[in-house]
């Protein structure tokens, strides 16, 4: 592995997504021969993602992307938040998984995997909507045969309940230094919004500047695991900062120290 390794991840891929925006993404990715990790929602019921009419050729489209080298992940089950629980790492009080019993989560994950496999889509990679999951999620993933979750605030891969947690330390494009492992997250359907349109330019700039450091998922995860105790502390400190310190510092900056 190189000193600098970057993974590109796209969330919210489903039959009713904004195909024109996602095509903008795939055109750029193809130009630089980059193969992202894409999160496919097995049975999307999120009203915010019901953007276009259901595309009956969606699953064939996913298989074509897979043939090009895209890595498929399962992104939740229906992408509907039905608990008001934070989970292990996220700041918001909403989740599709965290807070549910092991059995409930196992049933969701098992059914989601069955839907994917009914369309000949097979994967052992998962990530939850809004980065919200808990220990029961990891246990259920392990029982369902998953091996990876693209999430967590450690700096190196660690293993929990048999699942390799591949760090995803931001909800967008991280500040990239000259070494380290980074996951850049994109939501193509949001690019139509004035406050999110810049993300397309961020993708383009990332591809232009770092194309040689962007790795396919299978290569990206081929790295030594970190020391669990150390990485667990790093994650807990980061979560504490994001939940309890960052907002207070922002308040001071904009309301106390403003000119």
Kindly give the residue locations of the regions a language model identified:
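Hydrophobic faces of well-ordered beta-strands that scaffold small-molecule active sites
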Residues: 6-10, 36-38, 72-75, 123-126, ...
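Short, flexible, mixed-charge acidic loops at enzyme active sites
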Residues: 80-92
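C-terminal domain-boundary segment and adjacent tail
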Residues: 33-40, 191-259
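Acidic-and-aromatic substrate-binding clefts and catalytic sites of carbohydrate-active enzymes
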Residues: 13-21, 43-57, 84, 102, ...
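Active-site beta->alpha N-cap acidic-glycine motif
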Residues: 1-68
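Catalytic domains of cell-wall/extracellular-matrix polysaccharide-remodeling enzymes
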Residues: 96-169, 197
């Amino acid at each position: 592995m190189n000193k600098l390794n970057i993974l590109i991840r796209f969330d919210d891929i489903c039959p009713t997504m904004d195909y024109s925006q996602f095509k903008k993404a795939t055109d750029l990715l193809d130009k630089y021969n980059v193969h992202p990790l894409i999160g496919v929602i097995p049975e999307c019921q999120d009203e915010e993602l019901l953007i276009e009419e259901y595309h009956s050729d969606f699953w064939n489209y996913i298989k074509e992307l897979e043939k090009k080298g895209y890595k498929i992940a399962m992104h939740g089950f229906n992408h509907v938040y039905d608990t008001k629980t934070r989970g292990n790492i996220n700041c918001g009080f909403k989740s599709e998984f965290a807070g549910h019993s092991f059995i409930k989560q196992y049933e969701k994950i098992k059914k989601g995997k069955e839907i994917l496999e009914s369309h000949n889509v097979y994967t052992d990679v998962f990530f939850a909507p809004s980065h919200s999951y808990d220990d029961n999620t990891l246990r259920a993933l392990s029982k369902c045969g998953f091996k990876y979750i693209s999430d967590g605030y450690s700096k190196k891969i660690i293993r929990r309940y048999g699942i390799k947690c591949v760090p995803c330390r931001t909800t967008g494009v991280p500040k990239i230094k000259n070494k380290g492992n980074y996951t850049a997250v994109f939501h193509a359907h949001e690019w139509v919004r004035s406050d999110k349109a810049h993300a397309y330019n961020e993708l383009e700039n990332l591809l232009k500047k770092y194309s040689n450091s962007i790795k396919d998922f299978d290569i990206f995860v081929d790295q030594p695991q970190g020391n669990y105790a150390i990485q667990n502390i790093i994650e807990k400190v980061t979560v504490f900062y994001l939940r309890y310190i960052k907002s207070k510092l922002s308040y001071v900056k904009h309301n106390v120290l403003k000119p």
